[in-house]
Amino acid sequence: MTVTAAASPAPARFSWASLSRYGEAPVRAFVEIGQMVWFALTAVGQIPFAMRRYHKEMLRMVAQMGMGTGAMAVVGGTAAIVGFITLSAGSLVAIQGYATLGNIGVEAFTGFLAALVNVRFVAPVAAGQALAATVGAGATAELGAMRISEEIDALEVMSIRSVAFLASTRVVAGLVVIIPLYGLAITLAFLSQQVTTVFFYGQSAGTYNHYFHTFLRLNDVGWSFAEVILVAVVVMTTHCYYGYTASGGPVGVGEAVGRSMRLSLITIVVVVVLTAMAVYGKSPNFNLTV
C-alpha cells in the first residue's frame, strides 16, 4: 500500500492589478475633492449671473426651503425642524451645564454657559445639521432625480447654465433662509436653557439673567451669524454637488444622499471649530469673574 503526500497549495502570486487598484483609491479621492472644490467655486462664482437671470427660480427656492412642501409644510417646514433641534440642544446644555457646575459649587454660572456655548458652538452646529437634514438632503435627491432622468442634460441643450440655474440659486436661497432661521434658532436655544435652569432646577431668575447678560456680547452674536452663513454655503454646495453628479439610477441617488449627509455632518463641525479657533483662539473675549 502506497501513501501519496498531499500536494502543497501553490504560493500566492503577487498581483500588480490588485496593488494598482488599492493605489488608485487615494488618487480618486483627491480627484473627487478637486471636482467638489471646483464645483463649489463655480456655483458661488455664478451667483451674480443667477440673480440676474434666474431670480424667479431663486424666489421659488426660498419659499420651498423656508416652509417646505407637502407633509413638511404641515408641521411648519424647515423653521419647525430647526426650532425643535435647537430647543433640545439648549435644554441639554442647561442640564449638563447645571449638573457639571454644581459639582464644584458654581451652578450660578449656568447663564454664562448659555451666553458662551450656545452662541459659539451649539446653535451654529444645530442649525447647520437641521439645514443639512431638511434642505440639503432634499436638494441632493431633487438634483439626483433630474440627473438620472436627463433633465440636466436637457437644460444644457437649451443653453441654460445648469450649475447657475440649479446650484447657484439653491446656495443663495439657503443663505437667505438661514439668517432668519438662525435668529429663531438662537432665540429658542436661549429660551429653552433659561426655562430649564429657572423653572426645573429652581435657580433664581435674577442670578441667571445677571451672568447671561454679563457674558453675552453682540460681537459674539455677529460672529455666530457669520459662522452659520459659512456653514450654509458649505452645506448647500456639498449637497448640490452630490445631486448634480449622481449616477446609477434611483439607487445611485440614494447613495448620493447618504454620502452628502455624512460629509455635511463632518464639515459642519469642522467649519464651526475652525471658525471659533480663528476668532477666539488667541483671545477668548471674556473675563470670568464672580
Regions found by a protein language model. Give the residues of each.
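Short cytoplasmic-facing helical segments at TM-TM junctions of multi-pass membrane proteins
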Residues: 143-168, 249-253
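Selective transmembrane-helix segments that form parts of the transport pathway or gating/packing helices
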Residues: 70, 74, 122, 126, ...
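Short, membrane-interfacial amphipathic segments enriched in basic
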Residues: 8-60, 242-247
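Membrane-helix cytosolic exit motif
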Residues: 243, 266, 270-287
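Hydrophobic alpha-helical transmembrane segments of multi-pass membrane transport proteins
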Residues: 106-153
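Membrane-interfacial helix-loop-helix connectors in multipass membrane proteins
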Residues: 87-119, 184-229, 238-259, 282-290
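Membrane-interface helix starts
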Residues: 49-59, 63-78, 265
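Hydrophobic alpha-helical transmembrane segments of multi-pass membrane transport/permease proteins
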Residues: 72-91, 268-278
